């Protein structure tokens, strides 16, 4: 068995096999275009790849690899993100996925990575057997309160590429004091935003939408929100505010709610740090996040147990 980068026919085979699980309502052709378009972004060309465990030319298991940077306890570390771990049905139960993950972690260690990170949709037990440890994170359901005395007094505009450097700065402010947070460059932000926009654009008309808005002062973004609407409901994918109270973010959501008053209060859900609580919203409930965040050290001395309440990881970055 050997670990190889999946391209050409192997990549085509993997995309065909994984489509029934992760097709997201796309056609099979659109699903393949979605992955390839992510790879074609500036960040994706060098930091997103697909890998396969092969024997005799046969794909035994496959996974995506994301080359990430993160901050933990004031240190910047390299992190190997692992996603879409898949074994063809006829080959399951033989330990191929275990061997693949071990090989990816060993390769990450050789490349200087300190941690491997994944998000499990199948519970924690399986990946705990592979040496991962769950980091409990939560998702909040939030009701946006109506503005008082008419329309909210904040001006917003659609966000675009020119805003990403400023948003990267807002993200850097948000991670101060975090027990674990990604280092989010402008190129990385362009990648994760493109991933959502491509999914909406390649899917059936009207199934999904992506809303990206900023508030600016002196031609610089001082707050932003990214909201998606679709089969998973209204998701507050990402947000940031130069004001620690989050009042601008709250006011921006009030503006979005005011566009459709007949629909009633705007309700969104997302991974929101408990310390971030704008006065314009009310937390309806808090539940464990559906995708379980899990870490595994790539080297023996690098065990990491970040305080869950201090993890900063927006929904937009989950893979």
Task: List the model feature ranges, each with a label.
Residues 84-87, 93-106, 245-259:
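Conserved acetyl-CoA-binding loop-helix of GNAT-fold acetyltransferases
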Residues 125, 131-150, 226-319:
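Active-site/acyl-donor-binding loops of N-acyltransferases
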Residues 45-46, 60, 66, 83, ...:
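Core nucleotidyl-transferase/polymerase catalytic module
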Residues 50-52, 58-68, 81, 86, ...:
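Conserved beta-strand in the GNAT
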